[in-house]
Amino acid sequence: MATKAVNPETQRVKLERKERAILDAARAVFVEHGFDGARVSEIARRAHIGEGTIYSYYESKAELMLAVLQQFWDGLTREAEAVMASTRTERFYDRLQALGQYHLNILIVNADFINLSFALRRNNSEVSVSRDHLRQYVAVFDRLFLRGQDRGELRRDAVLWQARDIFYGSLEYSGRSIEMTLDADHKMREQEPVVDQIVALFRSHYGAVDGSGGTDSSTFDQLSQKLDLLSDKIDTLSNQLS
């Protein structure tokens, strides 16, 4: 009697569905218990599969943690690229506004997991997400910034990595500050003004100046003052978090 053939496509879909269930359960357990406190048996229970099945996908808990981290950052990259693709205008500052709003919201909604991933990066190189995945994510900003320079909207002498650090660094600390107010008695800080201020900062410092491609001393003074204020806010927030 002939054996009924298994549709390879159906089998692949089942395997992918099972892997997604493992990764979703693993992320929840890692956030709740941290990497060291997480147990593979608990992940298996939440994914409704046997513990041995997890090891057929991932050789160790560390490998599973890496897969969760990579899935997360790769997903963010795809979403950020989709935000850029859906932003109809080509104007740099409008697109920067859209990317800033997306990134700030992601930081707040996923605060627990992002904090875990940064802690692992500092303390556990075995399960730290690779720089390649982070580079792919921030490359969305890099392409936007370089295109702004090509279009003549931004200064030609602007340093990309400095602009990138200001953009993501400011949003990171603002996101933490906003997230800290979610369960507090006082009103939660609004997201939109934060992004508006960052866009205004980029406009005042990085905006192209007709005929020079540079900027005057007053613009540098304004940027210096704004960065000093940002530094003070970061110091205050760091003290609150410590």
Describe the function of each predicted region.
Residues M1-K4, A139, R143-R151, R176, ...:
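C-terminal peripheral helix-coil segments that are non-catalytic and often amphipathic
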Residues R12, E19-R20, V40, A62, ...:
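Short, structured helix-loop boundary elements
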Residues T77, N105-I106, S125-E153, W161-R176, ...:
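Amphipathic alpha-helical packing segments from all-alpha helical-bundle domains
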Residues K18-A26, I43, V68-F72, L76, ...:
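Generic hydrophobic, amphipathic alpha-helix propensity
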Residues E32-D36, N110, R151:
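Short coil/turn segments at alpha/beta junctions that flank glycine-rich nucleotide-binding fingerprints
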Residues A21, V29-E63, A67:
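Helix-turn-helix
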Residues I106-E126, D142, R176-M180, G214:
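Amphipathic alpha-helical segments used for helix-helix packing
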Residues A67, E81-V109, F167:
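Hydrophobic alpha-helical connector segments
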